[in-house]
Amino acid sequence: MKMKSGMEQAVSVLLLLSRLPVQASLTSEAISQRLRVSPSYLKKLMRTLVQAGLAESLPGTKGGFTLTKPLADITLYDVYQAVEGRGSMYQGKGLLQSVFEGESHCVLETVMAEIEDKWSNLMREESLQHVMDRVGELYDLEKIDDWVIKQVKGQL
């Protein structure tokens, strides 16, 4: 199973935004520099996250992006749907019907849909808060918090 790199980037952006102090935001320029992605790509990703209701865009010269809700209320499935879209992962071509003539129902499509449902349910159970908790076990969050504060102060 393969996901676009946008999934990891979107999760990273949302986790980064969660480190913001109350009433603060991060510019797309700061986020793109931190993630080492092109500013134009980051703007497209941010538009996607805003349209999905996961991030908010604040206008003005001191504007930027912030989360719309706590990480505990955002699931990996929410992010996946925002980045990958709502279509089915598996698109059958009807080859089984060609091999085993006579049946109009694609068994493989049914099996793949069942697997996709299970996978989707697992992603619905994983909040970004749980991901952040695991990040905190492995990384020094103080470093990113210091970087975030520096960026916020630079906007003032």
Curated annotation (Swiss-Prot):
Keywords linked to the UniProt accession: DNA-binding
Residues covered by the HTH rrf2-type domain: 2-133
Listed GO MF terms: DNA binding; DNA-binding transcription factor activity
PROSITE patterns: HTH_RRF2_1, HTH_RRF2_2
Keyword DNA-binding listed: yes
One Gene Ontology term, aspect cellular component: cytosol
Gene3D superfamilies: Winged helix-like DNA-binding domain superfamily/Winged helix DNA-binding domain
Highest taxon of the lineage: Bacteria
GO biological process: regulation of DNA-templated transcription
PANTHER family in alphabetical order: HTH-TYPE TRANSCRIPTIONAL REGULATOR YWGB-RELATED, WINGED HELIX-TURN-HELIX TRANSCRIPTIONAL REGULATOR, RRF2 FAMILY
Name the record gives this protein: Putative HTH-type transcriptional regulator YwgB
Organism the protein comes from: Bacillus subtilis (strain 168)
